Regions:
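Catalytic core of PPM/PP2C metal-dependent serine/threonine phosphatase domains
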Residues: 158-191
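Short, flexible micro-motifs
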Residues: 123, 127, 178, 198
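Conserved small/polar residues in nucleotide/adenosyl-binding loops
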Residues: 192-199
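N-terminus-centric sequence/structural signature that marks the extreme N-terminus
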Residues: 1-154, 191
């Protein structure tokens, strides 16, 4: 598969600056590519059988895996990562799958540089997902945390600031939840409990 990925990157005009096999099932690429159409780029790469992009960004890298925080840190040498901020979440899945796709953090596919970790439950997940899918968004899992990432990224794609997108989520998302968002230059946190019908 790696050979096919490399050939596809070359066909698309992407120049590989650095590549690293972090684990037998994981590759990390740093590429130079004209990112006018990230959706087309990601769809071409993911059309390769058995290949999935777990994150893609100019300034933000999402590292996802199964295991506790120390295991993931050791696997990916996170103690050597240089950056200004990070978010992470070790959790026990209760509603979603237990696989790398469903692990936190989530990015706003196909919009780079927006990442989310979340605790809680969205009660209007399927309604919001259908709305976003009808706008052309694609989901990699059935985890409601991913919906928050796509929701915020879609708002920012249309000109909202992180703060504005998060404020819009107060009326657009329903449930009891807390989430953190990281962008290339910002961090945001929101704690929300839906008003009681008696209020």
């Amino acid at each position: 598969r790696k050979k096919i990925v490399d050939e596809t990157l070359a066909e698309m005009g992407a120049k590989v600056i650095k590549e690293e096999r972090t684990l037998p099932y994981s590759l990390r690429y740093e590429i130079d590519y004209d990112t006018k159409d990230l959706l087309d780029f990601s769809q071409r790469i993911e059309s390769i059988p058995g290949v999935e992009i777990l994150s893609m960004g100019k300034s933000l890298e999402v590292i996802k895996d199964l295991g506790n925080a120390k295991m993931v840190c050791d696997r990916y040498s996170l103690d050597k990562v240089v950056g200004t901020h990070a978010i992470g979440h070790a959790r026990m899945a209760t509603e979603s799958g237990v696989d790398i796709k469903s692990a936190h953090p989530f990015w706003g596919y196909p919009f780079s540089d927006v990442s989310v970790v979340h605790n809680g439950q969205l009660t209007n997940y399927w309604n919001n997902r259908r709305v976003l899918e009808n706008k052309g968004m694609r989901f990699m899992s059935e985890c409601d945390s991913e919906l928050i990432a796509v929701y915020i990224a879609e708002k920012m794609r249309h000109g909202a600031t992180l703060e504005e997108g998060m404020k819009e989520s107060l009326t657009g998302l329903d449930g009891v939840f807390t989430y953190f968002v990281a962008t290339k230059d910002s961090l945001g946190c929101l704690l929300y409990t839906s008003p009681s019908p008696r209020d």
